[in-house]
A protein has these predicted regions:
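C-terminal transmembrane helices and immediately adjacent loops/tails
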Residues: 1-171
């Protein structure tokens, strides 16, 4: 459901400032590939850390349910990262698509509800409120890490533009 809501993102005025794209160009840019691989790597990393060293410090019997929760919430929070192209921050437009926020919120509540209520069907165990908070907090770091990476890339891009404007020194 979050993917469908992303399809109705409001128009971004800054998109008009970009250079036209060749009609034969790939729909997936290098920055998108980098972001997809980077976020997949980070989600895999936190899942591996939870699996190997139990970073959330939960009972072993709850391990699989916690892993499922981390995966589901990481994917859900990663939907926010997909709202902007290239290395643009999601923060300025975070609350502009109310429908997307509602759908993501409903999906988050449904994730917890179905895991708790239909645990036998999902082969899960009930989790405490504190365990859900830990899962959500860890999963939310997908947004934080993505924003930090985008910020660093914007800084380097800005520095490179400044370097291009500097006069060349011949040796």
């Amino acid at each position: 459901p979050p993917a469908l809501a992303l399809g109705i993102e409001p128009f971004r005025n800054h998109l008009l400032d970009r250079k036209p794209v060749n009609r034969n160009a790939s729909i997936i840019t290098k920055s998108m590939i980098f972001t997809i691989i980077g976020n997949a790597f980070y989600i895999t990393l936190i899942l591996m850390l939870q699996s190997s060293i139990n970073i959330l410090n939960v009972a072993e019997a709850k391990g699989e349910t916690v892993m499922f929760g981390i995966f589901a919430f990481s994917a859900l929070f990663n939907a926010f990262n997909c709202r902007e192209f290239n290395f643009d921050s999601i923060i300025p437009n975070l609350t502009k698509n109310k429908l997307a926020l509602q759908i993501i919120g409903i999906t988050a509540v449904a994730q917890i509800f179905f895991t708790q209520v239909f645990r036998d069907f999902f082969n899960a165990v009930p989790l405490s409120v504190m365990e859900w908070i830990k899962i959500i907090a860890l999963s939310f770091t997908v947004i934080i890490v993505d924003e930090v990476v985008k910020f660093v890339f914007r800084l380097f891009k800005k520095e490179n533009k400044n370097d291009e404007n500097m006069p060349k020194v011949e040796a």
